[in-house]
A protein has these predicted regions:
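Flanking helices and flexible, charged tails adjoining ferredoxin-like Fe-S electron-transfer domains
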Residues: 1-9, 45-130
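A short, basic/flexible loop-to-alpha-helix module at the beginning of a structural domain
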Residues: 2-7, 272-281
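Cysteine-centered iron-sulfur cluster-binding motifs in ferredoxin-type domains/subunits
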Residues: 9-30, 40-59
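Short, compositionally biased
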Residues: 75-78, 209-227, 278-291
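Ferredoxin-reductase
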Residues: 148-153, 160-261
Length: 429
């Protein structure tokens, strides 16, 4: 059998995937897409660059099946999967070889695109990807997949946490309903770091009679707990009332979580994430850029740094926060943020729909502080974190590029250093 008719097809395991969108956001050629059921890889577009593999929090992206090219699994087939298909036998591969010879002139490109049901793809120029794939050198070592399908211990499939707090953190009476929830794990070890996330499994079954897929939420508390020394963690969750097109819909997990009462329990898996972690070395600076519930990891990092400085265990280092929302009323944690000392954290709010004010986005706020940001871009001890809706990512990167050039830096060189030194972290969805 000639290798030209065989494809080592890149696939995503639907049983392990937590639908966090990390793979789709990381793919530079648009080969990964999704529907309400699964995330899938287009065999006709995937160029095996592997950019999606390191950021995946669960390892569900790192799966492969050897198939005859004419039998490459289509997007339609993958979207309907509940588990990965078994490996083909040698006889099945041989039979596929015969089909390949009969169906085409033997061109791998032709049979691959025929199998995937698309026309021959045009060459795709991948845009530069400046996001870090690893944590800062001084970050704490994370534990991942302690609970869930990927757990090393088969007895640790799910952890149970008890709700000990649930408070709204956006203005009451407004449509944007965001909650701060505190989950207590009791005697169950559940180690998390700032920048990691967990998966929440909503109760009940889906339309197919299967347990619901876990929904991913970023940790909003420091590593030693929402209350220092306690085995608890907090989340920032917005109640989903409409889909991306603006159509009315009740988000399953978000509404379940926002409606929880103190004393009720939830099923948790994780933790996930090994790269979106904060630096811990003295004099390290952190620039945080976020919108909405993207503030969760920023709150965690800020509180850990505050506790460390208060205890005299951290020396120097700047904290800058660029926080965007449509209005002040929709901005989570507005009150507590106002009470933080200005010498501890430098905060810029950006409102795009505040009555009486001009539209201002986080990228505008960055440009307004170009002198400060320009210096920090060139400082090897400064780390940038971007978290929020995917739509903000391009605007933020363009702003950083403009600022770099404004202060006489070459963006391609600075961008390459940011990536190599793991100084620019992107977590958008």
């Amino acid at each position: 059998m000639t290798s030209s008719a065989v494809l080592n097809q890149h696939l995503i395991d639907p049983e392990i995937c937590i639908r966090c969108n990390t793979c789709e956001a990381s793919c530079p050629v648009g080969a990964i897409t999704h529907d309400s059921n699964n995330y899938v890889v287009d065999a006709a577009k995937c160029n095996f660059c592997m950019a999606c593999v390191p950021p995946c929090p669960t390892g569900s992206i790192d799966n492969w099946r050897t198939v005859p090219i004419v039998r490459a699994y289509s997007l339609e087939a993958q979207l309907g999967w509940e588990e990965l298909p078994v490996e083909l036998t040698a006889d099945e591969l041989s039979a596929g070889q015969s089909l390949a010879n009969d169906a085409s002139d033997g061109s791998p490109a032709q049979v691959a695109t025929t199998a995937a049901g698309v026309s021959t793809p045009q060459a795709v120029s991948a845009p530069p990807n400046y996001g870090a794939l690893c944590a800062p050198w001084s970050a704490a070592v994370p534990q991942v997949n302690v609970y869930g399908p990927s757990a090393n211990d088969p007895d640790k499939t799910i952890a149970t946490a008890t709700v000990t707090g649930n408070v709204r953190v956006t203005q009451v009476g407004k449509q944007n309903d965001t909650h701060h929830l505190v989950l207590d794990f009791g005697t169950v070890p559940f180690p998390v770091l700032e920048g990691q996330s967990i998966g929440i499994i909503a109760p009940g079954l889906d339309a197919k009679g299967k347990p619901h897929h876990a929904r991913q939420y970023s940790i909003a508390s420091p590593r030693n707990g929402e209350r220092a020394g306690y085995n608890n963690a907090s989340l920032t969750i917005k109640r989903v009332l409409e889909d991306h097109e603006g159509n009315p819909v009740l988000g399953l997990a978000s509404n379940f979580m926002c409606d929880l009462k103190v004393g009720e329990t939830v099923q948790v898996i994780g933790p996930f994430g090994s790269s979106f972690l904060m630096p811990n070395h003295p004099h390290s600076n952190i620039v945080m850029i976020c919108t909405g519930t993207g503030s969760a990891p920023m709150r965690a990092m800020t509180e850990w740094r505050r506790r460390e400085q208060k205890a005299g265990r951290f020396e120097g280092g700047k904290l800058l926060l660029f926080f965007g929302a449509r209005t002040q009323a929709e901005l989570p944690y507005f009150g507590p943020l106002q009470s933080l000392p200005k010498e501890f954290i430098d905060i810029e709010f950006a409102y795009s729909r505040e009555p009486g004010l001009s539209k201002r986005y986080v990228q505008d706020a960055l440009r307004d502080r170009s002198a400060d940001i320009g210096k920090l871009l060139n400082d090897p001890n400064t780390y940038f974190y971007v978290c929020g809706l995917k739509a903000m990512e391009e605007g933020v990167l363009l702003a950083l590029k403009d600022i770099a050039e404004e202060v006489g830096l070459v963006w391609d060189e600075i961008g390459a250093h940011l990536k190599k030194d793991n100084r620019l972290h992107l977590e958008t969805y």
